Amino acid sequence: MTIKLAIDCMGGDHGVGVTIPAAIHFLAVHEDVEMLLVGQPDAIAAQLKRLHATANPRVHVVPASEVVSMDDPVEVALRKKKDSSMRVAINQLKEGAAQACVSAGNTGALMAVSRYVLKTLDGIDRPAIATAIPNEKGAGTTVLDLGANADCEPEHLLQFAQMASAMVSVVEQKPRPTVGLLNIGEEVIKGNEVVKQAGELLRASDLNFFGNVEGNDIFKGTTDIVVCDGFVGNVALKSTEGLAKMIGEMLRQEFSRSWFTKLLAVVALPVLTRFKRRVDHRRYNGAALLGLRGLVIKSHGSADAYAFEWAIKRAYDAAANGVIARIAQAFESHHDAAGAAPVSTSAPAADAA
């Protein structure tokens, strides 16, 4: 089966200089993929010429005259820039021309446009942002929400867990992934009322609920999935990224102190290389906007070509494993079993940067 991926070529801090090289390199190692490169034709053509990919039959240019900048308010992206590369790329999903969309654009705009164009799946009140964070076990812990919903009701946290369980079960081939609820302690009496009530809902559900987990459990890999509201999740994600950069910089400084430490660095290079690979945040780039009637993957805005290619891989894996259909099926099963309609609430604009 051929998988078609729509790439927002103009999004992010670096635009076509990153997105197109990543897409072309991914094509070279995946023969079952076609790329829909969405953006300004002249800019795309210049990159394709530089990469000697102009005549590639699996590359299709989809014109879009506008660009959503990283500073554009949601209202501008949603109401004024209707021919932006972001909007046109998402339209490819709605029209069935692509199985997934990848964008490094403004998170708030991407969530708002995606929700407006694609709508949410039945039974889901609010979409959530989910990604994997490195852990000791090497597989990565899937954490959500990472910034789409700063304030949540208990039912929303349950839905986040249901969506993530459906995704992880097919992408990572884990039939019953474990779910942890992020809290300030493992005891059921701890946490605010929302977290306590969410814990009760999770314990009563058919999910493989482990119980409350703390922040350090994300990195231990205690559970396959960790659920929290978007405010807590975004702080955890940004703290993780900052810590990884700090450790890398401190190692560089220490190994540069003298000729002896520089010699030690050479001796330790194989170990340091393996360590860097395990904690390299670029390998975990690509967050899924779960809960929509289409597969949208958000790349970090500052991603380089290597990191953006990992976001493309996330989209490819999710599309190949039918994640959207699996989530829809899961919610149909959950609500058939519950015999109750989902809570209806309005969703705020995404808060993540």
Curated annotation (Swiss-Prot):
Keywords: Cytoplasm, Lipid biosynthesis, Lipid metabolism, Phospholipid biosynthesis, Phospholipid metabolism, Transferase. Signal peptide: none annotated. Disulfide bonds: none annotated. It is found in: Cytoplasm. One of its GO terms (molecular function) is phosphate:acyl-[acyl carrier protein] acyltransferase activity. Pathway: Lipid metabolism; phospholipid metabolism. One of its GO terms (biological process) is fatty acid biosynthetic process. It catalyses: a fatty acyl-[ACP] + phosphate = an acyl phosphate + holo-[ACP]. One of its GO terms (cellular component) is cytoplasm. Its EC number is 2.3.1.274. The keyword ATP-binding does not apply. Pfam families: FA_synthesis (PF02504). It is an enzyme of class 2 (transferase). The keyword Transferase applies. InterPro entries: FA_synthesis (IPR003664), Phospholipid_synth_PlsX-like (IPR012281). Homodimer. Probably interacts with PlsY. Belongs to the PlsX family. Catalyzes the reversible formation of acyl-phosphate (acyl-PO(4)) from acyl-[acyl-carrier-protein] (acyl-ACP). This enzyme utilizes acyl-ACP as fatty acyl donor, but not acyl-CoA. This is Phosphate acyltransferase. It comes from Ralstonia pickettii (strain 12J).
